[in-house]
């Protein structure tokens, strides 16, 4: 039974954000707080986008009227899964229970 690395993307809404860095810090902190009791083994970091014109890496954050939408990337290692699909379901179930109302999408599954 192989091990897998499952990478998920989530969207966090942050109110009263003063800057992009502030919004990212708050989103990562909130994700960590929610994941800590049940899924503290999940790696959380800020999402990154590539500019289609200059290919420069940019933070995955948008602020309008002091409300930010922050893309957060989460990585979870799933051990001894039956298949890639099984690893996806395990990761979604584990992280989804901790982040009940946060939208999640799997962006990559890699066999270790």
UniProtKB/Swiss-Prot annotation:
It holds the Pfam family DUF555. InterPro entries: UPF0212. It comes from the Archaea. Belongs to the UPF0212 family. This is UPF0212 protein Mhun_0078. It comes from Methanospirillum hungatei JF-1 (strain ATCC 27890 / DSM 864 / NBRC 100397 / JF-1).
């Amino acid at each position: 039974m192989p091990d897998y690395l499952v990478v998920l993307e989530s969207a966090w809404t942050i109110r009263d954000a003063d800057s992009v860095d502030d919004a990212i810090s708050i989103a990562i902190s909130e994700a960590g707080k929610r994941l800590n009791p049940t899924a503290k083994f999940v790696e959380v970091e800020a999402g990154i986008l590539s500019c289609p014109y200059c290919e420069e890496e940019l933070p995955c954050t948008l602020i309008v009227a002091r409300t930010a939408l922050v893309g957060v990337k989460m990585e979870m290692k799933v051990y001894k899964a039956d298949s890639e699909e099984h690893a996806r379901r395990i990761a979604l179930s584990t992280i989804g229970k901790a982040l009940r109302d946060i939208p999640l999408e799997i962006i990559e599954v890699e066999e270790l």
